[in-house]
Regions:
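Carbohydrate-active catalytic/glycan-binding domains of CAZyme proteins
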Residues: 1-474
């Protein structure tokens, strides 16, 4: 059975970079902490899967700890990427938060454990990213073709800040204010060529795709680069994947060359879901996004992440099938099942791909900041590392949707809930008045939809799981 998020209950690994190494798919990402105060507070872990079964992932354990980096005590390990070098070893590229430095760790195995190797340096020997005229470096991506090594990075502002926001950012950045100022001046993502030592630059960094304040964004207008660089090559075409200035969407651009000539292609996926033009709203809670594309078994998959716990700092990875036609990717829709069609079985409530209140959602972090106590959210009772996620605060006006399912033959949906209230499940109702979890079966009548919808009718309940059953009471 395949569900989203694709990693186990209670695992928070966003910024996913999937790579096919030695016959398995290895997943590299940052590592959030449940209830964390900022991004990426935990050490890197790696998961791997058989390429024919992206529903079953094996934890390879901690592959790199922040104290292994000389700057690790001052920050956290942001989104990494990994590549097999010309020498057959595996190189992990990453950046410690608020450093503007790309660092490298190395290992003989894609599953770790990695050891610190050094920092990427310019031709004059200085650590690139530390110079006053250097671009702001962030979210590295790496491509190795024979002895040619390309490194991609960058972060561009997606808006101009108000004075009150600038005051906050000055306080946040403190001694790194100069670093923040460089970031605010960035107009493009950048690409660099590295020598075979995987550390030393060959030549200078080149601008690659435009950010929001580039003089001429060209084909990228409306979807300019924000962050989250990733790179893939399919056939003879290079695909640059990135998060746009809208934050919640992953986009792609294509070129016949790895270091220039990229033209905007389109949207891959938005963690905000579908956009309602008439109402001017997206359909689920959203936030920043970062991921990439995997090709396996003649099928393409887009990896991305979503937000939980009314926060930007407890993110989880998701997968969707994605189609390519004539070299162009078509946008993926959000699903609970990695784009597969599932049937009878038991599904955790946190696999809901749509969550909203009164037809409204928005950025996840702002829901808590604005004190919107009526909004539902995904959370857990235990501390970080302990499974047990569920949908909390499901009140009148709340809505959860699970896609994509084959509901032919399903005659009952049992919902496990607690609290005091009533929810509507399809055309039936489930009621509880209990402090503990209680399973309530609800008759289900076949419809033409491929989704399950639960809405809050009154009271306040939590939802742990749903079970789709053939036969039953209908």
């Amino acid at each position: 059975m395949k569900i989203n998020p694709y990693l186990p209950d209670g695992v928070y690994v966003p910024d996913g970079e999937p790579h096919l190494f030695e016959g398995r798919v290895y997943l590299y990402g940052s590592h959030d902490r449940f209830g964390g105060e900022t991004f990426c507070m935990n050490d890197y872990v790696c998961y791997s899967a058989d390429p024919s079964d992206l529903g079953s992932w094996r934890c390879e354990g901690v592959i790199y700890r922040r104290e292994q980096d000389p700057r690790g005590k001052e920050g956290y390990l942001y989104a990494p990427d990994c590549a097999k070098g010309p020498d057959g070893r595996y190189y992990l590229y990453y950046s410690v938060s608020d450093s503007s430095v790309i660092s490298v760790a190395v290992c003989a195995s894609p599953a770790g454990k990695f050891e610190y190797l050094g920092d990427v340096t310019a031709e004059d020997g200085h650590v690139f990213g530390t110079g006053e005229e250097d671009p702001y470096l962030f979210d590295p991506a790496v491509l190795v073709e024979g002895t040619d090594v390309y490194l991609y990075s960058g972060s561009c502002p997606y808006r101009r800040f108000k004075e009150t926001q600038i005051a906050y950012l000055r306080n946040h950045y403190g001694k790194n204010l100069r670093l923040f100022s460089r970031q605010m001046k960035s107009t493009h993502s950048v690409v660099m060529r590295l020598r075979s030592d995987m550390l030393s630059m060959r030549g200078t960094a080149k601008p690659l795709v435009p950010g929001a304040f580039a003089e001429n964004p060209g084909t990228f207008s409306g979807h300019e680069f924000f962050e989250a660089s990733s790179i893939r090559k399919f056939g003879d075409t290079y695909y640059f994947i990135y998060s746009s200035k809208l934050c919640h969407e992953l986009c792609w651009a294509a070129s016949s060359r790895p270091d220039e000539g990229f033209v905007y292609g389109g949207l891959l996926v938005s963690n905000a879901g579908r956009y309602d033009e008439e109402r001017g709203r997206y359909e689920t809670y959203c936030g920043n996004n970062h991921g990439s594309i995997l090709e396996t078994g003649r099928q393409y998959y887009v990896f991305y992440h979503r937000q939980t716990n009314r926060s930007s700092f407890s993110r989880q990875g998701c997968i969707e099938k994605i189609r390519m036609e004539s070299g162009r990717f078509l946008p993926a829709s959000l699903s609970s099942t990695q784009g597969e069609t599932e049937g009878a079985g038991e599904y955790p409530a946190y696999s809901a791909c749509i969550l909203q209140y009164d037809g409204n959602a928005g950025f996840s972090a702002s829901r808590a900041a604005e004190g919107r106590e009526n909004h539902p959210y995904i959370t857990q009772d235990g501390p970080d590392g302990v499974p047990g996620q569920y949908i909390a605060n499901f009140r009148q006006g709340a809505k959860a949707v699970w896609r994509s399912f084959d509901l032919s033959g399903i005659r009952e949906i049992a919902v496990t809930i607690r609290g005091s209230g009533v929810v509507r499940v399809g055309s039936g109702y489930a009621e509880t008045d209990s402090g503990g979890w209680r399973e309530v079966p609800v008759p289900f009548y076949e419809n033409e939809e491929n989704e399950i919808v639960i809405t809050g009718e009154y009271g306040n309940v939590d939802i742990l799981k749903i079970a789709l059953r053939e036969g039953g009471t209908a």
